[in-house]
Amino acid sequence: MSYGTNVVACCRRDLIPAVKRFIDGMPNPGTCFETPSIYALNRMLEHADARVCFMAAYFLPDVGLVFGADLPCPYETRLLRQEDFAELYLPEWSDALCSDRKELDVLGVGAYDNGNLVGFAGCSADCGSMWQIGVDVLPEYRRQGIASALTNRLARAVFEREKVPFYCAAWSNVKSVKNALRSGFRPGWAEITAKSNQFISEKFGKIGNFIEDEG
């Protein structure tokens, strides 16, 4: 990961020398995350039967923007707590909640149309002081400002609990990046994560297998 002026890397002990050479060979931190460098990183990871899997941008809140934003929601909103999530572990809310680690999902804000949940922002307690926000809106309710309204409301609720909200988006997910900015967040750091080829094939199915076959 990089905060802009540095690179922080975590890897298996046997990969440390190669990773150090990779980082030290770059003219600046940002170059580590550019496409030619990622190709080189993948070649290095071949020896560990792994390759780059996730490429994400993380956003931190601008307190003035979070509390100063005027983001009305066209639907009723409700604050939800962990005990309200049991029936919400569904594909349509997979960015807001994570069924693999339910114990970390702690708070949420839902948008309701005549009692039906149409948008949902949830946050997970990824560490003791910072809670990560994710948001989903049903396709037929998008482009109404629901995502940014829910994200902003949840960020405020997180601050009220004396935690720091943060937000993650895949680099290519421009809509999600725009939502972060509208909701009062600003770029914090960039991150690349490598996973085993088996993990990628299992998680991404045909896409993962295609990439593996092509490699």
Give residue ranges: language-model regions.
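A conserved beta-strand-loop-helix scaffold within acyl/acetyltransferase catalytic domains
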Residues: 100-107, 112-130, 135-138
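Conserved GNAT acetyl-CoA-binding A-motif
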Residues: 7, 129, 158-170
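Acyl-donor-binding surface of acyltransferase catalytic domains
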Residues: 1-85
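Conserved acyl-donor/pantetheine-binding loop and adjacent beta-alpha core of acyl/acetyltransferases
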Residues: 49-52, 69-116
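Conserved beta-strand-loop-alpha-helix junction that forms the acyl-donor binding cleft
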Residues: 167-181, 186, 193-198
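Conserved acetyl-CoA-binding loop-helix of GNAT-fold acetyltransferases
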Residues: 133, 143-157, 178, 182
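Long, contiguous binding/interaction regions
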Residues: 13, 108-110, 125, 191, ...
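Conserved catalytic-core motifs of GNAT/GCN5-like acyltransferases
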Residues: 52-61, 186-203, 209-213
